[in-house]
Each structure stands twice: as structure tokens, then as C-alpha cells.
């Protein structure tokens, strides 16, 4: 069955894929990240954008396009790919980059990256998330608790 996406409003997306429906808007995404990482909603929004932007540079352009189709509209601007191909970096590089951009310390940033990945897993269909995650080093996968 092909994936179908229908916008209910500017920030809410419903995605059907193999009978799976996911409904999450950007505000819910930020709220979930804030709760998981124990941050303010504003900090969670900044963190989410920084993490998604960095991770999008780490995966193929095709995977970024697939992820964009599955995200709430307000998060799409954070997800752009590197026209020169995926950029290689490890988890420590990601944490350092996001920490510098958000002003969070490295412990808060690591917890925040975990929160963004966990929330992303809930916000997009399982297949899309697994395809995205498969292009990241194993150390990124280890951040996620078992579903």
C-alpha cells in the first residue's frame, strides 16, 4: 500500500502506511521532547530543529525526502540535505554541534538527542523511521530505549 499524507491543518499531519495512522503536530512534538529531556518548550523546539538539521546532513538525499513527507509541516524547514552527499560525523560530533548551537551543556544535549529520536520514532511511521535510522551509525541507535 502506498503512503498517503493528508494535512489537517498547517501543523498537523496524518500519515497512513500499511494501515498505520500517525497524528502529531509540531507543538506536540516539541512538548514530548520537552517532557522527555526536562527542558522548556522553547529549548525543546530549538533542540529539535538543531538535531533534525544535523541528522539530515548525515543521511542520503532520498532518505531526507522521505522523512520530510512524514514530518509535521513546521519541522520540514529543519530537514535539508547536503548537496555534496551525506556528511560523516559521530555521536560526539553531533552532541558538540547541537550543544554549541543551543547553549545546552553536553549532558542536556545528549538527553535531548535521545528525546528527539524517541519522539521522531513515534511521529513517523515505523518503516520510515527504521530506514532513516539505518543510515546512522550504531551508536545513534543505542540511544533509543526499546519500543
Where are these regions (language model features)?
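Intrinsic N-terminal pre-sequences and regulatory tails
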Residues: 1-35, 146-147
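Short, flexible domain-boundary/linker segments around small modular repeats
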Residues: 13, 24-39, 89-104
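Short, recurring structural edge motifs at helix starts
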Residues: 18, 36-42, 50-56, 98-107, ...
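Amphipathic alpha-helical interaction segments
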Residues: 28, 46-50, 66, 70, ...
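Hydrophobic/basic alpha-helical segments enriched in Actinobacteria
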Residues: 34-37, 59-60, 102, 129-132
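Acidic (E/D-rich), amphipathic helical modules within compact regulatory domains
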Residues: 37-86
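Short, solvent-exposed interaction modules
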Residues: 74-127
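Preference for long, well-ordered alpha-helical segments
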Residues: 112, 118-147
Amino acid at each position: 500500500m502506498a503512503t498517503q499524507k493528508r494535512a489537517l491543518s498547517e501543523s498537523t499531519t496524518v500519515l497512513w502506511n500499511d494501515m498505520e495512522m500517525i497524528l502529531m503536530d509540531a507543538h506536540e512534538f516539541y512538548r514530548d521532547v520537552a517532557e522527555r529531556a526536562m527542558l522548556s518548550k522553547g529549548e525543546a523546539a530549538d533542540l529539535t530543529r538543531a538535531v533534525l538539521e544535523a541528522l539530515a546532513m548525515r543521511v542520503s538525499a532520498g532518505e531526507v525526502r522521505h522523512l520530510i513527507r512524514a514530518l509535521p509541516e513546521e519541522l520540514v524547514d529543519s530537514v535539508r540535505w547536503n548537496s555534496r552527499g551525506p556528511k560523516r560525523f559521530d555521536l560526539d560530533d553531533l552532541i558538540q554541534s547541537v550543544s554549541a548551537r543551543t547553549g545546552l551543556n553536553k549532558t542536556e544535549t545528549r538527553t535531548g538527542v535521545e528525546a528527539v529520536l524517541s519522539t521522531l520514532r513515534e511521529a513517523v511511521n515505523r518503516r520510515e523511521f527504521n530506514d532513516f535510522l539505518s543510515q546512522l551509525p550504531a551508536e545513534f541507535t543505542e540511544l533509543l530505549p526499546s519500543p
